[in-house]
């Protein structure tokens, strides 16, 4: 079983779409093995997105991700990383396929409802950023 990390971003929480997005995730065959609601500080958001520090959108991303509560989750499924990225769609909702999370719910490239890990290796690192081993519940 592969795992991936997702974050339901502040726009998702603000628009009261947590349940709708989790429903799509579970209907797609993913199991939620860890989940919490938290609020990132600018410092914490900056650490999480440090890989983008030199990108022009970094400051806006950090500001947005610290603007309200978010819901990080670890999801489990065969081929979890690729399947989840397919489920959520392109970063820009205008480019996302019909029926994807971002096409359905996102307003813009910057406020696009959800983060999804881009590799199994990054998923493991990102999951460790939010969750201790004790917080991950094995689903059999």
From Swiss-Prot:
For this entry, list what GO says about its biological process: CTP biosynthetic process; GTP biosynthetic process; UTP biosynthetic process
| Pfam family, any one | NDK
Q: What is its EC number?
A: 2.7.4.6
Q: GO molecular-function annotation terms?
A: ATP binding; metal ion binding; nucleoside diphosphate kinase activity
Q: Which family does it belong to?
A: Belongs to the NDK family.
Q: Does the keyword Amino-acid biosynthesis apply?
A: no
Provide one Gene Ontology cellular component. Answer: cytoplasm
Swiss-Prot/TrEMBL catalytic activity: a 2'-deoxyribonucleoside 5'-diphosphate + ATP = a 2'-deoxyribonucleoside 5'-triphosphate + ADP; a ribonucleoside 5'-diphosphate + ATP = a ribonucleoside 5'-triphosphate + ADP
Protein's UniProt name: Nucleoside diphosphate kinase
What's the source species for this entry? Answer: Chlorobium limicola (strain DSM 245 / NBRC 103803 / 6330)
Q: Report the enzyme's class at the first EC level.
A: transferase
Subunit-structure text:
Homotetramer.
Q: Is this entry keyworded Signal?
A: no
Q: Which domain of life is it from?
A: Bacteria
């Amino acid at each position: 079983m592969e795992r991936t990390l997702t974050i339901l971003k502040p726009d998702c929480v603000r628009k009261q779409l947590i349940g709708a997005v989790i429903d799509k995730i579970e209907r797609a065959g993913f199991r939620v093995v860890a989940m919490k609601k938290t609020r990132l500080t600018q410092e914490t958001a900056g650490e999480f997105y440090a890989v983008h520090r030199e990108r022009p959108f970094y400051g806006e991303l950090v500001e947005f991700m610290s603007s309200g509560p978010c819901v990080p989750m670890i999801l489990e499924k065969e081929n979890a990383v690729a399947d989840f990225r397919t489920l959520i769609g392109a970063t820009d909702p205008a480019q996302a396929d019909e029926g994807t999370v971002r096409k359905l719910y996102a307003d813009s490239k910057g406020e696009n409802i959800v983060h999804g890990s881009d590799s199994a290796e990054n998923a493991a690192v990102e999951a460790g950023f939010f969750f201790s081993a004790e917080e991950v519940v094995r689903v059999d």
